[in-house]
From Swiss-Prot:
Keywords of the record: Cell wall, Cell wall biogenesis/degradation, Glycoprotein, Hydrolase, Secreted, Signal
Lineage: Eukaryota, Viridiplantae, Streptophyta, Embryophyta, Tracheophyta
Any one GO CC term of the record: extracellular region
Gene assigned in the entry: PAE4
Catalytic residues of the enzyme: S199 (charge relay system), D295 (charge relay system), H362 (charge relay system)
Protein name according to UniProt: Pectin acetylesterase 4
Length: 409
């Protein structure tokens, strides 16, 4: 209102100019806050850990595009010394889209278009180059692959014709194009490699784990770490298959079934094969699971999704576990039990590893990887646990006690 009233004046005084300047600064500041909502969760990093964006040079020839048709990209930090022939790929997360409308909206954000990617991103946690923060992988070649397809790097272009849309469903082609590019940059000679990612990136890690293994030297040590990617296929508190319906719609919309294990797809409804409880049965490559048994993303989107039919107590509890009453905590403990039961078969897998804590969090291998304040189980951080498992220093099958027993959360 201040600026509008001033614009209606023919001549401005010094005080008018001052008010206008203040107004413009406030507007710009408010926009910067709205577009930087994750800054509080990012630790301070050295300038050397700010890594520039590179758009894929292989994407166009492969027909690999983000939802809006822009080129996909990644951030690459070259390895050094003993890590020169070791590679760590991190798949960015960010949910997914199940309808033409939601994918169209997503195409106008950084999760659907490289036009909105940051030109530099901080590498911290599992991507850090600081040995005190990342003791086992700090000097590896480290890559963050940006997520812009809305279907876990697994969509196929056939779906575009089926749905008569101008959107590009090319997640699988994005994955293949960037893999080709990294292989040409030296990854084809890797001695050690690890594929990882969080949330949708953690789910993508499981989907593409064997592809990653199969495209690297046979004598290389190749393993996969899924963070926050073990999504449960359970009914919500109202008895609805919320997460199952979501996966079904994503798989159907973007023809994701073509990227899933075909033996599984032949036996059951394809979207069920996207859930880790099924997909893990068919993965040949060693896998490590990092998950919290009280994953707030799964609670808010799968177990207790926002709904007009939800009573007020659940509306409060779903957003803050500390506000949950005894009856609600019983439901959340039941959710934990469902996870423990689901990973029962994987628990006896000799090559597998796990770090299942009881924090009310989601992504952890960047935010809570290895520091004085990091989450621990049996006094081990996630970084120490993954390192012990990857380098075969010791078996790692860590499952936390129920919430709120872990003081390190």
């Amino acid at each position: 209102m201040v600026i509008r009233s001033l614009l209606q004046c023919r001549t401005w005084s010094k005080s008018d100019w001052l008010l206008a300047s203040i107004g413009i600064v406030l507007i710009v500041y408010s926009f910067s806050l709205s577009f930087n909502s994750t800054s509080d969760s990012i630790p301070s990093v050295d300038r050397s850990d700010l890594v520039k964006l590179k758009l894929s040079s292989k994407a166009k020839e492969r027909g690999a595009f983000c939802l809006d048709g822009s080129l996909p990209g990644y951030h690459f930090h070259k390895g050094s010394g003993s890590g020169s022939n070791s590679w760590l790929l991190y798949l960015e997360g960010g949910g997914g889209c199940r309808t033409i409308e939601s994918c169209s909206a997503r195409a106008m954000t950084r999760l659907g278009s490289s036009n909105f990617f940051e030109h530099e991103v901080p590498f911290f946690g599992v991507l850090s180059s600081d040995p005190s923060q990342n003791p086992d992988f700090f000097n590896w070649n480290r890559v963050m692959i940006r997520y812009c397809d809305g279907a876990c790097f697994s969509g196929h272009p056939e779906a575009e014709f089926k749905n008569e849309t101008r959107l590009f469903f090319r997640g699988q082609l994005i994955w293949e194009a960037i893999m080709d590019e990294l292989l040409s940059m030296g990854m084809s000679h890797a001695k050690r490699a690890m594929l990882t990612g969080c949330s949708a990136g953690g789910l993508s890690t499981l989907i593409h784990c064997d592809y990653f293994r199969d495209h690297l030297p046979k004598d290389a040590t190749v393993k996969c770490v899924s963070d926050g990617g073990y999504i449960l296929n359970v009914l919500d508190v109202l008895g609805n298959p919320t997460m199952g319906s979501f996966f079904h719609d994503v798989v159907t919309l973007q023809s994701v079934d073509k990227s899933l294990d075909q033996n599984c797809v032949a036996k059951m409804e394809p979207s069920k094969c996207m859930f880790p409880q099924e997909s893990l049965k068919n993965i040949r490559t060693p896998v490590f699971l990092v998950n919290t048994a009280y994953d707030y993303w799964q609670i808010q989107n799968g177990l207790v999704p926002d709904s007009p039919d939800l009573d007020e107590r659940w509306k409060i509890c779903r957003l803050n576990i500390q506000e949950c009453d005894a009856a609600q905590m019983k439901v959340l403990h039941g959710f934990r039990s469902s996870l423990i039961d689901a990973i029962g078969e994987f628990h006896v897998n000799k090559e597998g590893g796990m770090f299942i804590n009881s924090c009310n969090s989601h992504c952890q291998i960047r935010e809570s990887w290895h520091s004085a304040t990091s989450t621990r189980i049996e006094n081990k951080t996630i970084a120490e646990s993954v390192g012990d498992w990857y380098f075969n220093r010791k078996p790692v099958k860590l499952i936390d006690c129920p919430y709120p027993c872990n003081a390190s959360c």
